[in-house]
Design a protein with these regions (language model features):
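N-terminal segments that mediate ammonia production and transfer
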Residues: 1-204
Length: 204
């Protein structure tokens, strides 16, 4: 459990992770526009109980994913809109779709430094997913690592040191897991379609 830095921190239900129907979300950072996002949700009959930005994050993800039925690409675009030069380099048809998404959901788009890690059961496609999304201004870093071999492990953290510490701990429990990942990637922000988010899928 990780307690939030804002909201009703005294209540254990305000701690991470927050869980939707098919996903669990943890969050690093905070929203500058919490009240705007909460108002956006209330207009859709969703009312946060614990006044934390993490809670509204998972409500947003669940709204876009389950209620609206958006594919993951559109969910991420609604949360972290593609910006400026990255937007200009998109194909014209994708620009049209993204512009419509941004216009529809700009008041629900988190503003400020934030970074989500989401564990998701994509039951319709019979797979589990580990997803990392960061704000497109890249105010919070994001590192993804993949350990391959006898045991495949995908990890998303704010820092490489946290990934290495996690692998070291896992290797003490299971010798098939090495202490260093085979590959590391840093998110660059700007656009999830070009390295601004990571998705690790495990087919069921």
């Amino acid at each position: 459990q990780r307690y939030p830095t804002k909201g009703r921190v005294w209540h254990p239900a305000g701690a991470h992770p927050f869980i939707g129907l098919n996903e669990a979300l943890v969050h690093n950072g905070d929203f500058a526009n919490y009240h705007s996002v909460a108002e956006y949700l209330s207009q859709r009959n969703l009312y946060p109980l614990f006044l934390t930005d993490t809670e509204v994050s998972v409500l947003l993800f669940d709204l876009y994913n389950r209620t609206y039925g958006y594919p993951l690409e559109y969910v991420i675009e609604a949360l972290a809109p593609t910006m400026e030069r990255d937007f200009d380099q998109l194909p014209v048809e994708k620009q049209r779709v993204y512009r419509a998404l941004q216009a529809a959901h700009i008041h629900g788009s988190p503003d400020g430094p934030w970074f989500f890690i989401i564990a998701r059961n994509d039951w319709e496609n019979r797979r589990f997913q580990l997803i990392g999304i960061t704000d497109t201004a890249m105010l919070r870093p994001q590192v993804f690592a993949l350990h391959e071999g006898q045991v495949q492990v995908g990890l998303i953290c704010s820092e490489k040191q946290a990934i290495d510490a996690t692998l070291k701990s896992l290797s003490e429990e299971d010798p098939r897991v090495g202490t260093v990942a085979d590959r590391y990637w840093n998110a660059r922000g700007g656009s999830h379609t070009d390295g601004g988010s990571f998705i690790f899928s495990l087919e069921a």
